[in-house]
């Protein structure tokens, strides 16, 4: 549809007449006929707004131009024959001619490189091969890949070898430095030496696997372990004694060890407790390794550690045992248990340390010992009569005091338990000096507990005014750690408390209603 504004042609007469009579042909409500009473209304004329001269000059059809502004290639067929916009050759602008034209009139075209002179001559003569279409010279030619602007660099030729060096060139030709020769010789010697060692070892291994001869290795020290035990046993034999407490109706027997040249002997409390409680009815005697019997006097005893100290007088040339350090004992160390089991004096049994810090409860008929010891566990046999004797290491030093033995039957085999010598030193020194010893206490009683929440010592009751009450420990708290020692049950709690220092703050960790709480408690001395 042509929408151009045509101002040159006159408006049709019928539209002019209709505009003039516009008021006459305007439809009214209820009027179904035209001005002449017809049945149809005449259409409203097309409204053409007035055009000012400036708009007509800017947007009007140019003078002498016919047809629409449609490009020729998309113009309808009826307009194809119009030649209004056919391009014609025109001279270029003088400025463009000067910039892009030939430099001089009549000059030849762009020159070729002299190398291509033959190709140019052949091209002029028509004898050369047909050149492909050049889109730079022929706009109608199709685009194609041509010769690259820069030729690929030619590969470098392989370096010519200088030839192999002979032995004469290497040694006397001066082409290899003497330093390099020395290094090569050293490397060759090292490689040769390593190869010789490997070859020798390989031959020995192969011979060992293939030979039919069997050789047993023997040395002059084949009896060294047995000899070592013999020397250790002999070194401590005279420092071990047998202790006998006898009344008119009964008697008890155990062992002891001499710890001081003045005649002080350490033994277990349960060995002499009956005699200590009834001194008028019992007589205590010490029997030395040579069979000499000497009466003994009680210096002091401690039921809470099951230790006691006796003293013999007027005995010369006593053999004092060497005391070791139980903190250096390790599981697997070889040990000897020395004593008088079943009344057999100077009996030695051998074993190893199988555990450390083993809480072992002690109690027995006829004894006031009711405590827990922090024992060294050993598989060396400790039987009735061994109690109070020393547990010896391979340096002939006392590392413990044999105290208890456990077995599945009445046989001699089983496990033995000894009080560590470091604890024995503290107790013995206090008993020798003061005749008694005090231990730390918290003022609570406990029972063992183990469940999904906690395992330890559950507080059964708390004594009024005790260190535990002052420190905030409550009933039903489960104590899981005392100081630096974990507590697994009530027996271990007893041992852990005994290792605290009286009057010094100690951390106590408890589980209270599922929560871990750390309290500070200052132990008091016990009353006994």
From Swiss-Prot:
Residues 31-40 have a biased composition (Gly residues). The active site is at 270 (charge relay system), 306 (charge relay system), 387 (charge relay system). Belongs to the peptidase S1C family. It comes from Mycobacterium tuberculosis (strain ATCC 25618 / H37Rv). It is an enzyme of class 3 (hydrolase). Pfam families: PDZ_2 (PF13180), Trypsin_2 (PF13365). The gene is htrA1. The chain crosses the membrane at residues 179-199. Its main location: membrane. It is a single-pass membrane protein. Essential protein that may act as a regulatory protease that is conditionally activated upon appropriate environmental triggers. It catalyses: Acts on substrates that are at least partially unfolded. The cleavage site P1 residue is normally between a pair of hydrophobic residues, such as Val-|-Val. GO terms for cellular component: peptidoglycan-based cell wall; plasma membrane. It is found in: Cell inner membrane. GO terms for molecular function: serine-type endopeptidase activity. This is Probable serine protease HtrA1.
């Amino acid at each position: 549809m042509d929408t151009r504004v045509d101002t040159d042609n006159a408006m049709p007469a019928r539209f002019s007449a209709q505009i003039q009579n516009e008021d006459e042909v305007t439809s009214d409500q209820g009027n179904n006929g035209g001005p002449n009473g017809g049945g149809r209304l005449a259409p409203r004329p097309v409204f053409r707004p007035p055009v000012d001269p400036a708009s007509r000059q800017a947007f009007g059809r140019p003078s002498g131009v016919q047809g629409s502004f449609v490009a020729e290639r998309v113009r309808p067929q009826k307009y194809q024959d119009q030649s209004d916009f056919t391009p014609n050759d025109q001279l270029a602008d003088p400025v463009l001619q000067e910039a892009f034209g030939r430099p001089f009139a009549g000059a030849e075209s762009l020159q070729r490189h002299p190398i291509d002179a033959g190709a140019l001559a052949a091209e002029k003569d028509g004898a050369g091969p047909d050149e492909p279409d050049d889109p730079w010279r022929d706009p109608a030619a199709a685009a194609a890949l041509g010769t690259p602007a820069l030729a690929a660099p030619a590969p470098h030729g392989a370096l010519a070898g200088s030839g192999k060096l002979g032995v004469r060139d290497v040694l006397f030709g001066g082409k290899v430095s003497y330093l390099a020769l020395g290094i090569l010789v050293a490397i060759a010697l090292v490689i040769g030496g390593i190869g010789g060692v490997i070859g020798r070892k390989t031959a020995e291994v192969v011979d060992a696997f293939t030979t039919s001869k069997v050789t047993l290795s023997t040395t002059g020290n084949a009896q060294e372990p047995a000899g070592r035990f013999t020397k250790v046993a002999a070194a401590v034999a005279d420092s071990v004694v047998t202790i006998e407490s006898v009344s008119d109706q009964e008697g008890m027997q155990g062992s002891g060890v001499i710890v001081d040249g003045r005649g002080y002997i350490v033994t277990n409390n349960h060995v002499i407790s009956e005699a200590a409680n009834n001194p008028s009815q019992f007589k205590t005697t010490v029997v030395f390794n040579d069979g000499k019997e000497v009466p003994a006097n009680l210096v002091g005893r401690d039921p809470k550690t099951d230790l006691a100290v006796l003293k013999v007088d007027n005995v010369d040339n006593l053999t004092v045992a060497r005391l070791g350090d139980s903190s250096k004992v390790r599981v697997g160390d070889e040990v000897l248990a020395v004593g008088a089991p079943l009344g057999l004096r100077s009996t030695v049994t051998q074993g190893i340390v199988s555990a450390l810090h083993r809480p072992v409860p002690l109690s027995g008929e006829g004894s006031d010992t009711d405590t827990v010891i922090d024992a060294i566990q050993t598989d060396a046999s400790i039987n009735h009569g061994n109690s109070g004797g020393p547990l010896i290491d391979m340096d002939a030093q006392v590392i413990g005091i044999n105290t208890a033995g456990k077995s599945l039957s009445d046989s001699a085999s089983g496990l033995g338990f000894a009080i560590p010598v470091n604890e024995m030193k503290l107790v013995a020194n206090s008993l020798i000096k003061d005749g008694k010893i005090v231990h730390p206490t918290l003022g609570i009683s406990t029972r063992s507990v183990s469940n999904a929440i906690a395992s330890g010592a559950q507080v059964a009751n708390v004594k009024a005014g005790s260190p535990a009450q002052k420190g905030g420990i409550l009933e039903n708290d489960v104590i899981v750690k005392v100081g630096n020692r974990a507590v697994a049950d009530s027996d271990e709690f007893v041992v852990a408390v005994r290792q605290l220092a009286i009057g010094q703050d100690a951390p106590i960790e408890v589980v209270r209603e599922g929560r871990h709480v750390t309290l500070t408690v200052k132990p008091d001395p016990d009353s006994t």
